[in-house]
Amino acid sequence: AYTKGKPHPMIDPEKRIECMESAVDDESTGVILLDIMLGYGSHEDMAGALIPTIEELKKKAEDAGRKVFFVATVCGTRKDFQGYDEAVKKLKDAGVIVCENNKLAVRTAIQAIGLDFEEPVKEIRTKKTAVVEKAEPSEKLMQLLSQKPKIINVGLKSFAEVAEDFGCEVVQYDWMPPAGGDVRLIRTLNFLRNYEGIDEANKRVIAKVVASQPVIKHVKRAKEVIPQIAEGKVILHAGPPIEYKNMPDPVQGSCVGAVLFEEWADNEADARALLESGEVKFIPCHHCNAVGPMGGITSANMPVFVVKNETDGNEAYCTMNEGIGKVLRFGAYSEEVVNRLRWMRDVLGPTLDRAITELGGLSVNPLVAKAVAMGDEFHQRNIAASLAFMKEVAPTITRLDMSEKDRYDVIKFLADTDQFFLNIMMATAKSVMDGARTITDGTIVTAMCRNGVEFGIRIAGMGDEWFTGPVNTPKGLYFTGYDEEDGCPDMGDSAITETFGVGGMAMIAAPAVTRFVGAGGYEDALRVSNEMAEITIDHNPNFIIPTWNFQGTCLGIDARLVVEKGITPVINTGIAHKIAGYGQVGAGTVHPPMECFEKAIVAYAKKLGFEA
C-alpha cells in the first residue's frame, strides 16, 4: 500500500512522480503507463502537474543513451471541468503517446519496447435474456429519483463540496483508517481488543482512580520523606531518565540553582564543574514516588508536599510552586531565585506543615470538585483551587506562634501565587495514579512526562517501563519580546495532571485558558474536551464540569484508543526560554509523540504472546 497515509494519486501527483522517477532510474524500464482521471474529486490539472517531470525524465533517459516511452489514457468527458481535449493536447505536446482506452494503451506499450502480443480468440456465446418481474418502485425510491439526495460523505471533502454546489443536503464525516492504516498496528489493536480481560482490567484501574482519597498530610524537606535523596549529592529531575550532559539548557540551569541552594558550590562556575564531574547523581522524580514541574529539579532540602492516597496507603511528593517569571523550574538560578527557595525552606514550608498538621490533613477531592466548578482546569488555571487552599489554611496560620512579618509574608505569597495549587494537584495525581497502577494489567496510561529531550509514558500492563519518543515544542502565546524561536522543547512531570484527567483534558472547565495558551475560545475548548473523551473510557463522577453539560472530567486514557483514532492527549504547559536564566516566556499546548503509545501497545501485546 504505497499510498498509505497519502492522498490517492488521482488527487495528488506527488507519489506518482516519485514512482516515475524511480522507474526511470531502473535501466530495465522502457515504457511508463499512466492514466489521467478527470472529474470531481480529481486533481484540477493532473496532466499539467505531471508534464514537467515527464519532460525532465525523458531528457534524463536520452542523456543516458536510453529511450523511455510514456503512454497514457485520459479517462473523462468533455464536460469535466479539467477539460478532456486540453488534457490530451498537453500530454501529446510533451511527447506522451495518448491512447483512447487501456487495452490500446497496453498494446501500444508492448509494441513500443519491440514486443508483440497476440490476443487470444474469445468464445462467442449466445446471449441469454433474463426474465425479470416488473415491480412497483417504493415511495423511498421515487423520492430518491425525484428529489435531491441527502448525502453522508465519508472521506474526501471535495466530493461533499460538489454536492453542496448542486443544492444537496450534505453531512461531511471525517474518517480515517485505524492507526493511520498501519497494518502492523491494526493487527496489534485487533489482538488487544479481543484479548480477554483487558477491558475489565482497565475498568479496575479507573475504579481505583475514582475511589482514591488523596490527603495533604505534611510539607517536609525532601530528604525527610524520599530516601533516595537523603544522602550524598542527589538531584531528582522531570521526565524519563536522562544524563546531565543531554539535558536542555534550562534544566541544566535549574541544576545549577539546586547546587547553589544546597551550598555544594559557591558560584555558577563551580556548580557547573561539579555537575559535569559526575559527582552528582540524577534520578527521575517518578522513580522516587515524586513529580516535579518543568525541569522537575528537586534536592534534599527543598520543601515538598506530602500527599497520601488514603485508599491505597501510598504517598507522593512535589516541590512547592515558586510563583511566575524567573524561577528555578524554568531554569533561572540568580541570587533572587536561590534566596526565594531558602525562604520557602525556612518559612513557607514549616508554616504550611504546622497549619496542615493542626488541621489533621487536608482532603484534596473537595478542593478539586469545588475549583473545577469555578473554572479551574488545574494545569494553567489554578486560581480557584489556590484560593480554596488558602481559605482552609489561613485561619490556622493566623493562630500560629510566629513573627508577624513571616505570617504576613506567607499569606501574601499564597494570595499572590495563582498557580500555587498546581504542585498540590501534581502530587495528588501522582498518588492516585500510582495507587491505580497496582493493577498490573491493561492499557490505561498511568504516567506522562518529559525531560526536554524525550517524552515518556507508562501503561498499567507494563509497570515501570517507559515508552519514549522525541519531545515536541509547545505551540502557544509568548510574552512580549519573545517568539517560537526562543521556546525550549517541552519538559516537566506536570502532564501527570492530564493523565489524571484534568489540565488540557479538561479544557472546557476553563474556557478562559484557551486564550492564554493560544488555543482559541469556548468552541475550541469544547472541541478539545470532546476529542479527549474519544480516547478515554469514562468520566470521573467526583469532578463535575458545569460547562460540559455536567459531565465529569475525562477518566482513563486508553493507549489503544490513542493509536486507533490517531488522537494524542493535549497538554497545557508553560514555555521556558531555551537559554537558562530567562525563565518562563510563554504558555501553550503540546502533544505527546504518537510513537510512545504505539511502542506501548506493541510491547504489551508481545507480553501477552502476540507478534504482529
What are these regions (language model features)?
Residues 1-18, 52, 76-77, 120-612:
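Anaerobic metallocofactor- and corrinoid-dependent redox/one-carbon enzyme cores
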Residues 1-34, 39, 69, 75-77, ...:
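ATP-dependent carboxylate/acyl-activation modules
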Residues 34-35, 73, 101, 173:
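Generic beta-strand/beta-sheet core signal
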Residues 46-53:
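Charged helix-capping and loop-helix junction motifs
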Residues 59-69:
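A short helix->loop->beta-strand "cap" motif at the edges of active sites that frequently abuts
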Residues 92-95, 166:
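Short, structured coil segments at secondary-structure junctions
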Residues 97-105:
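Short acidic-hydrophobic, aromatic-tinged amphipathic segments that line or gate anion-handling sites
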